[in-house]
């Protein structure tokens, strides 16, 4: 267990760190309020814009059980790069769009495709080339375009969604990003555990390109 400060100097130092931390967190409130307002307003004007708690109800979002299934699929990276270059996006965005297509086809096969697009929670590195310290990760919400039949149009919607999330985070401090993520994701986590607020769904699936263990 963590030991308590043993001297007045240690106590003063701990209180100073606590005060600095609280001040830094409090300073994020205006920025968070501004971003939440912007998100809510833009969502009213753009049907493809990803707002908070707009993920639709799907057959995927049920009580978690012990049943598990693993499937793997390989694709040529060179082909993905050609597509990414043609559409002016990243390979990761192409993969997100492919996942959107796969989910759309699966939902259609189950007669369960919602009218609204599925939303993915995507871990994203926020590190700058000159930044110090450990990992800096943010969680963005991406529109997977599952309501769109045309693959090219779907890719454009996914790309726009990812870019908007990146631009939003680029204008925020690390503390604001952390608190914004917590504010938008925490209610969803609570709902997953309790099922008390089924409408508080920020995302339907998690899609990540974080490498797994090499062995």
Predicted regions and their residues:
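Soluble acyl-CoA-dependent acyltransferase catalytic core bearing the H(X)4D motif
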Residues: 1-215
